[in-house]
């Protein structure tokens, strides 16, 4: 996020009088708080200077609903794409995903289609169903939080003590299970580590 901020605020050169893309403070706020409120400002101050935002951004506050939606959408996208890529690359098999309860239910729904359709098509549908479950959960949970926290304005969102756009507790467990599975089976897979190390050597 800091590198993205550096690109849009300093490195891009599109105007005579200043560097950056001239983005609104609301957009920059969303970029900065992509992973939630910022407590440690040292890195931001080092790159941009202490007075860059002229007190227009309160780092300890939450960000807008739009920015929170973008952040959680990233999580859903990363999980689903990595599951599909891992299966396509034969880093793990479909049956291994049955250890994750929610995925087991989704996979079971497509069991009868194995003889009729290709495994690639079935995997795509399973991934779509997984995305659908996560998106529906976010919508339902967010609606509840808006009501519980009496959110009526952007200021209410900024001042909220917790993220408004989020998974339910059960879906958070599911999200954690997927990330843990991918970490073990994909990100730390021997073939992936070899290619990662090769990439590091090229960059150096």
Regions found by a protein language model. Give the residues of each.
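Histidine-centered, transition-metal-coordinating active-site segments
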Residues: 2, 7-16, 20-204
């Amino acid at each position: 996020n800091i590198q993205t901020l550096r690109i849009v605020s300093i490195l891009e050169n599109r105007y005579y009088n200043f560097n950056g893309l001239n983005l609104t403070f609301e957009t920059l706020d969303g970029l900065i708080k992509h992973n939630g409120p910022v407590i440690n400002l040292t890195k931001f101050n080092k790159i941009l200077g202490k007075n860059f935002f002229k007190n227009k951004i309160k780092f300890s506050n939450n960000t807008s609903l739009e920015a929170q939606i973008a952040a959680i959408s990233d999580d859903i996208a990363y999980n689903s794409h990595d599951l599909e890529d891992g299966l396509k690359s034969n880093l793990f098999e479909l049956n291994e995903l049955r250890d994750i309860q929610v995925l087991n239910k989704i996979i079971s729904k497509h069991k009868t289609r194995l003889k009729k359709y290709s495994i690639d098509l079935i995997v795509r549908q399973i991934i779509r169903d997984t995305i659908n479950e996560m998106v529906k959960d976010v919508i339902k949970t967010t609606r509840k939080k808006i009501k519980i926290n009496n959110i009526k304005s952007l200021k209410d969102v900024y001042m909220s003590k917790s993220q408004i756009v989020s998974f339910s507790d059960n879906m958070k467990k599911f999200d954690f299970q997927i990330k843990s599975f991918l970490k073990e089976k994909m990100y730390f897979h021997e073939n992936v580590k070899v290619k990662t190390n090769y990439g590091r050597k090229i960059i150096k």
